[in-house]
Amino acid sequence: MKTFFAKFIVALFAFTYFSAFAEPVTLNNSPVRSFVQWYSSKTGKSVIVNPDVKGNITVFNADVNNANIDDFFKSVLNANGLVVVAGNPAVVSTPLTKLASQPSNEETYDDESDGVAYEAVPQSAAPAVPADLTVRNFNVTRVRSSDVLPLAKIFVDSNGGGNVVDYPGNNSLVVSGSAQVMPALSDFITSIDVAREQVLIQSLMFETSVSNGVDLSFALALASGGKVAGGFNTSALGTALSTAGGSFGIFNGNILALSLQAVQSDSNSKVISTPRILTQSGQSGYISVGQNVPFVTGKVTGEAASVNNPFQTIERRDVGVSLKVTPVVMGNGQLVLTIDTKADSLSNQAIASDIITNQRQIQTTVQIKDGQTLLLGGLISSNQFDSDRSVPFMSKIPLIGWLFRSHSDSKDDRTMFVLLTAHVIRAL
């Protein structure tokens, strides 16, 4: 009888103890952060929640007590793509499949440890941190650090990984990675930290009459019948420049000054522009002179809009002379020039309701030597001129008024040429 009474007392005490600490948990689409906050308040442990953690949790009728609350917490997070990994502080990483291929931190999980922090993060595992992680600043002295940044990233990624950040205020790169990679990275940055040559582009853009060309034979310092690169015969060069079909040549020496004098002294020729550009090798240089002209792109009147408030849309475009050159200095003293030159003008014709522009453009890529002059041309434009003259009052007399009026038509065909000289300015 005493034995039965003792067992009854023990069973009653156990039931009372379990009932006191067991708690049914039901979560219906509750936020993850609320679940983590509930766990922290029940256990008294610190919990860190990653800012990227989002989503909701659903749990139905789970009995949780002090003995299984940690397992319950981990199980719920795992079921929702989150996993608690022990540490000091503990870190939660995913995906679980990736964690399975690495040493499991859950083997050292200590349910009884106090002050352990848990971090809940989404399904993205951070890259492994090198054991000899170090941070170093590399100063770049001859080029921009932003130009070196892509190459430095490729080098670091191919040698164990790391992080490279551009510090433009100091023109330097801040690199974090393995200490073993830093010496090789320093040598690599030094090898590409080399000042680039600059190229001075001098140009003469001019136009001449098709019927009466300008004679540049003296300026080009070539005898009659001489040859230049490309097989361009300079016999009677003035006639050659006025011939339709274009011209091309590469000449030794800077002949722009003499050519400018020859064009200015010729009454049938006109200097359009003499642009000069200084730019680095591999960088584009651009210069433009002209007008910003409004062009009507749309108009709304009548039924499409209120008659009292008609409107039209206007787009402004640059009309004038522009030169864009991208030089690349080669190792053998050669230069590769990508040239885009344009000469636009407003037409005097009024056959449309909007503005008409005359366009002449040359786009090409050539290779010349340092100091040589390039001739491009053959862009012909035709201008039609109509003029009416009359004697006031007398021209309006019936029958004989035509004797005091005159009408003339004229046509002027002009060809545009471009002379371009490139000089390499060596880095100090």
From Swiss-Prot:
InterPro entries from the UniProt entry: Bact_Secretion_Sys_Channel, GspD-like_N0, GspD/PilQ, NolW-like, NolW-like_sf, T2SS/T3SS_dom, T2SS_GspD_CS
Stored Pfam families: Secretin, Secretin_N, type_II_gspD_N0
Entry keyword set: Host membrane, Membrane, Signal, Transmembrane, Transmembrane helix, Viral extrusion, Viral release from host cell
Thylakoid listed as a keyword: no
Topology term for the membrane: Single-pass type I membrane protein
Record localization: Host membrane
Coiled-coil positions: none
Signal peptide: 1-22
Domain of life, source organism: Viruses
Main location: host cell
Sequence intervals crossing the membrane: 319-339
Subunit structure: Homomultimer. The channel is composed of 14 G4P subunits that confer a barrel-like structure. Interacts with G1P; this interaction results in a complex that spans the inner an outer host membranes.
Entry protein name: Virion export protein
Organism: Enterobacteria phage I2-2
Source taxonomy: Viruses, Monodnaviria, Loebvirae, Hofneiviricota, Faserviricetes
